[in-house]
Curated annotation (Swiss-Prot):
One of its GO terms (biological process) is rRNA 5'-end processing. Its main location: cytoplasm. This is Putative pre-16S rRNA nuclease. The lineage of its organism: Bacteria, Pseudomonadati, Pseudomonadota, Alphaproteobacteria, Rickettsiales. One of its GO terms (molecular function) is nuclease activity. CDD domains: YqgF. It comes from the Bacteria. It is an enzyme of class 3 (hydrolase).
Length: 154
């Protein structure tokens, strides 16, 4: 189920169970995982498959392996806050994922996270090829960190 309110999302979470975040792109998905205490967001991996059924199966495997209790998906909206074509693509993906899992899904504004992740990796001297392979997972960890910071105040 897709939850639009962060407080409601938080109420549905099981204490001391991790969360995952997804940075959804047309060519790849970045995945991040929190620790059980939800104090740290870590890049987990990148899914480079574009077939949605395979992507959802991969996500189900990750959800089962790490026993997560909630999913955060980065929602790409433009700088003015307007919905874009990519926003609609991500919302459709979230709806498809919601049909496959019985977990709360929260859509988090992800403006500029991939760019920020790429810049962060660049500042650490990561080569361009490696940045492109890892920036989505790092972006997912930034999306997750934003939510983790927000739920600390609930």
């Amino acid at each position: 189920m897709i939850i639009k309110n962060l407080q409601e999302f938080y109420r549905l979470l099981i204490p001391n169970v991790p969360l995952i975040a997804i940075d959804y792109g047309n060519k790849k998905l970045g995945i991040a995982l929190s620790n059980q205490e939800r104090s740290i967001a870590m890049p987990l991996n990148t899914i480079t498959e574009i077939n949605k059924k395979i992507v959802i199966t991969s996500l189900l495997n990750i959800i089962e392996k790490y026993k997560v209790c909630g999913v955060i998906i980065g929602l790409p909206i433009d700088m003015s806050g307007a919905v874009t074509e990519q926003t609609n693509i991500v919302m459709k993906f979230a709806e498809e994922l919601a049909k496959s899992i019985n977990l709360p899904i929260y859509l988090q504004d992800e403006r500029l996270t991939t760019k920020a992740a790429n810049n962060l990796l660049k500042s650490f001297g990561v080569k361009r090829k490696d940045r492109n392979n890892n920036d989505d997972a790092v972006a997912a960890s930034m999306i997750l960190e934003t939510v983790l910071d927000s739920i600390k105040n609930i």
